[in-house]
Each structure stands twice: as C-alpha cells, then as structure tokens.
Design a protein with these regions (language model features):
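C-terminal accessory/tail domains of diverse enzymes
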Residues: 1-90, 104-243
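C-terminal substrate-recognition regions of SAM-dependent nucleic acid methyltransferases
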Residues: 96
Length: 243
C-alpha cells in the first residue's frame, strides 16, 4: 500500500500564555499569514487565532490552520511550532490538539473500516496519550458502540448518530461541516515531532481503512500501517507515560 503523504489536513492547536495579538505579530514576521478572529467554524485560506471558552490559563487561544497539504503542510506547521516556542506558549490538561483529515472521497466501506479500526486500536492509542485524553468529556471513546452497530451503518449520518456528538475521539460531525473527519484525542502540544507523528499515524490509518480494518486486540507492534520507526516512537511514548 502506498502511504506517501500528500493528503489534505488541518490542525487546531489549543494553548495559553501568549496574547493572540503578540502571537499573530510573531507569526506574520515569520511569513505565516494569520488573522485574529472571534470564535467560528469557517475554514479560512489563512491561519486564524480564535478564543475557546473550554480552556484554562492566562491568554488562552486556539490556533487553527488553513487547509494544509502533505509534506509541504508539515513544513509550514513546523515553522508555526518554532514561533510557539519563541512566544513561550504553554499547554495544560485542558488543551487538546485536533487533527482534520480530508474525507471528501470516502466510500461508506472506508468510514466503517475507519471507525472499527480506531475502536479496535483505542486501548493502544490510550496508552500513548496522557490520562487526561483517555476518557475526557471533549473526546469520548468509541467503546459504547458495538462492532455490529458500526458494520450495519449504511450512511455517514447513520454512523454519526451511533457514535454520538462531536465530542468523541473520532468526530464525524466534521464531515457535514468541512468534508473532513476530525480526530480529537491528542493532548495539547507545541512539539512538532509529536504533531508530525500523530498526523502521519492518522493519515496511514485512513489510508489503510480504504482497504480493510485493523482487527480487535491488535498490539502496537502489529499495527499493519506503521513502519518500524513509528512503532518505536509510540513504544517509547507509551513507556514514558506509564513511568
């Protein structure tokens, strides 16, 4: 299977400790087009800095990307992370990192495979995420949906109804709004290596779902779409979080 990364994606970074005005200025000085806006769900051709009432801390914000594409998109994201570091941006347990993956061409089979695969991998993914992201009101799991209920869903709307509202680890409501699928589980971070690995993990998961599903009780070492480097990365993340 070809896992070359040329897919469209988007990212939402929740964080605090830098005023939106200062962050916007530093981003612009680094060649990143950004606008400070009120809370909204509109996809823009630029980065946007919006407020988010669910966050705790001083100078909280959500930085939302435009549509990014493949490796070039990751390079732009890396520049943004350099600026976040410059501005001493911080995260805490109230912050998440949300990733949107383009879902415009998905068949129903792909949607079912994706939901089943994430559900089957949830115990593994939970172990390389902090406890605050395991059963959080804003990113609830898929354990309440039986495999049979996922398999018998005939439309995206039906599948969405069975999973529930947008506050789940896999959010299907994003499809009607943006023609994407949103993954909400990752903890807040300003670390590019973490972001890159998670975006690529999701890209590969989605690519794999176009052909099949990951079986229940699959161990990290047996995830069919990960290469040895990513398996090692997440093995070490798991080890660190269990220490």
């Amino acid at each position: 299977m070809d896992y070359t990364f040329n897919r469209k994606f988007g990212i939402e970074i929740e964080a605090y400790n830098c005023s939106r005005e200062r962050l916007a200025r530093e981003l612009r000085e680094s060649g990143i087009e950004v606008v400070v806006e009120g809370y909204n769900h509109t996809t823009r051709p630029h980065w946007k800095l919006v407020t988010d009432s669910s966050l705790n801390g001083n100078d909280t914000f959500e930085l939302v990307s435009p549509i990014l594409v493949g490796e070039a998109g990751l390079r732009e994201l890396e520049k943004v992370c350099w600026v976040l570091e410059l501005c001493d941006v911080k995260v805490n347990g109230s912050c998440g990192l949300h990733v949107h993956i383009d879902a415009a061409g998905f068949s129903m089979e792909t949607w079912r495979n994706l939901a089943l695969s994430y559900k089957h991998l949830e115990p593994v993914i939970d172990r390389f995420m902090p406890a605050s992201r395991r059963d959080n009101y804003y990113c609830r799991g898929l354990g309440h949906v039986s495999d049979g209920m996922i398999r018998s869903a005939r439309t995206v709307d039906e599948l969405k109804g069975r999973i529930g509202d947008r506050y789940h680890k896999v959010n299907l409501e994003a499809y009607s709004r943006h023609k994407t699928v949103e993954f909400r589980q990752h903890s807040g971070t300003t670390n590019f290596t973490k972001m890159r690995n998670w975006v690529l993990f999701l890209h590969k998961l989605v690519t794999f779902a176009t052909r099949g599903q990951v079986p229940a009780a699959t161990a990290l070492q047996d995830i069919p779409f990960l290469d040895s480097e990513q398996k090692l990365y997440y093995k070490l993340r798991t080890k660190k979080l269990s220490a």
